[in-house]
Structures are given as structure tokens and as C-alpha cells.
């Protein structure tokens, strides 16, 4: 890997959780190479790969000039894409966000990991703190996660509470009308319908 790094300006580190920090210290920092890490790494403590968790919808400009940046997990990225437009449009009128993550047990390509026939609840998963790293620690965001025995996909259930006047359904939908990476489906009954629709658009899972 050293010879390839000597010819590189930027590394996208997709190694397993905890390996990114080792690669940073062993390979990237000595060569002064810019690096992007995936969500399994940390942004706080001795094992932090960066002091910034990146979300293109929230803090794109803040990443300019950074040597090391961590890209959030798919769940953390998805929450940012949905919640940030609501924050921008309705701001101080929002009382709190309550998010329930229904997480798949294992990714489709993780064939070596068995899907256990059980359901697990995590009251305070890391996803909430990860999102607060770019929303602000005082953001009224409350997250819990339920892990279910499927490989299909993740599902987010979001309850947005407003202080007084609640926006109409049309106002909420219009918030996402021009959002990149967000689609409104009226006929999907379940995650399979969403996957089938995404497949027709040539999205990769």
C-alpha cells in the first residue's frame, strides 16, 4: 500500500471499524495525505480520526481545507438529509425530533454474519450523538434504535413536534421538493417497494 500512497493526494479509507485510526497514524499523517473515513471510526477521544463528522446537506463548506474528515454512517447521513431541511424551514418553531431507527441485522453483502431471530432495543445509540455533532449538542433530538432480523434495509420513523402551529402536510412535502437525494413515494407499502423503485433508478445498495 505504501507505493500507492506515495502517489496519492486523497485516500478514502473504507477499512473495518477501528482500523482507520491505525491507518491514519501509520500511513496518512506521515505522508501528509488528506483522508476521508467511514462511520465506524470516532470523532472524539484518543482514537478520533477527525474532529468533524461530515454531512453534505449540513456542513459541506466547513469541510473545505480539512485534512481528515469522517463521513457519517448511512443512518446518520439519512437523518441529516431529512432533518436539516426541516430545521432550515421551520427553525425555532420545532420543539423536538424523536427518531426511531429500525435497523437491519446485517448488510446484504455480509454473508458471513448470521441473522438472529430476535429483536433488540438500544435506548441511546451512537447515531443521536453523531447527528448532534453537526446540529449542536443542545439540539432537541432523541434517538432510539431497534435491530430486527432482516437484511432488507433500514427504516427511520420520525416524529417532529412543533411548539404551536403545526405545518400542513403540503408544507412538509414542499420542504423536500427540490432536495437532492430525497424522493417522496405515495404507493410504497413496505421497504421492498422502496428497494424496487430505487433499483429502477439504478441506485446501488
Predicted segments, located by residue:
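C-terminal substrate-binding/catalytic lobe of Rossmann-fold NAD(P)-dependent oxidoreductases
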Residues: 1, 93-96, 100-101, 107-205
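N-terminal Rossmann-like NAD(P) cofactor-binding subdomain of oxidoreductases
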Residues: 1-108
